[in-house]
Amino acid sequence: YFYIKDGDTVWNPGWKPVKTELDSYSCRHGMGYTIITGQKNGLTASQLSFVPMGVNAEVHQVTLRNDSDAPKDVILTSFVEFCLWNAQDDMTNFQRNFSTGEVEVEGSVIYHKTEYRERRNHYAFYAVNTPVDGFDTDMETFLGLYNGFENPQAVFTGKMGNSIASGWQPMAAHQVKVSLAPGEERRFNFVLGYVEVPQAEKFVAPSVINKAPAKALLEKLT
């Protein structure tokens, strides 16, 4: 999901999950891509999503344009929930799954490395091509107690927890504060990627994962 906070109004380009009524909405599917566009209170948000050929990554290019006559200060928040590599097990084996989640944050890149140290040679990552103003990797910190995806605490308050998940439900969210003059447009590339590392190259130092494959992939896409 991508959340937009414009003043006191929170909305999504694709309507869900907040379900704020939009002034306009469109969804277009082409050959290998989808463009979702929403408009609310003079702000247009467009999400171009595609999987580039030959890489294990999904790209979401988010464009914000101020169509009003006044400057706007908005907050763009991304969100993905990481799986634990087995969809069936994710939904059933809670007594184990809630103890294994592990992440690492480096700049604007959030690495999901659950079980990488113990028995896996692959990890996932979620990145954006701009410095971030905050992040979260722990679901409860992001949503807030008893909240759902329609009203995440971090989005509605505009304050991320900069949480580092240790077990429970690992996820990734970036907060980007954007100032737009009338008519100005800004574009951001979010990349959700997956890499596999040869067993002998898993670590570059004790307990330090090999991030080189992820960084090489990001150089191509951002």
How does the language model describe each region?
Residues 1-222:
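Anionic coordination/interaction segments
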